[in-house]
Regions:
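Membrane-embedded alpha-helical bundles that constitute the cytochrome b-like, heme-associated redox core
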Residues: 1-179
Length: 179
């Protein structure tokens, strides 16, 4: 039997980096949306919606890839609390990548607005229009976006810690391809 790979599968790595760029863009677009009342606001909304749906679709693909391919093992000398932190942070990242787009979609539905991906593609509403539900979902979407931002920062810090301080191959497992 061959030794487990030290690297993630190519498709897993491609999805990781594509989604990392999309999520960073989404966080900045979202911040720009809530901070702007200019004409740019409408343009940012029209970027935010389809990008959120794309992230939702890609995270589903990513979960299929994650559960159908082998993951490189964490270093054997990694302290137990760091192993737990790695596992929990990945669960949180995946949960947020699933929940935030769904909350956004539900929020727009609760506002009574059409969920438009483009000028000709409209998604069905997830909820009926309700101002109270909209207000609750809007707050939840905002708070969870902050949580996603903090989780991404922790993920990045952990990756750099593994790459620059521990030099244990964890960062390289998502950057490089061949063993």
């Amino acid at each position: 039997m061959s030794a487990p790979s030290k690297h993630f599968a190519l498709l897993a790595r491609l999805l990781h980096w594509l989604m990392a760029l999309m999520i960073l863009a989404m966080l900045f677009i979202g911040a720009g949306m809530v901070a702007s009342v200019s004409a740019r606001h409408e343009w940012l909304i029209h970027l935010h919606k389809p990008l959120g749906i794309a992230i939702l679709a890609l995270v589903i693909v990513r979960l299929v890839v994650r559960f159908s391919t082998r993951q490189p093992p964490l270093p054997e000398d990694l302290p137990g609390w760091q192993v737990l932190a790695a596992k929990l942070s990945h669960v949180l990242l995946y949960a947020l990548m699933l929940v935030l787009p769904l909350l956004g979609w539900a929020m727009i539905s609760a506002a009574g607005d059409p969920v438009m991906l483009s000028s000709s593609i409209e998604l069905p509403p997830l909820l009926s229009a309700n101002a109270t539900t909209f207000a609750i979902l809007r707050k939840a979407h905002g708070y969870l976006a902050y949580l996603l931002f903090l989780t991404v920062l922790m993920h990045l810090a952990a990756a750099l810690f593994h790459g620059w301080i521990r030099r244990d191959g964890v960062l390289e497992s998502m950057v490089r391809g061949k063993d």
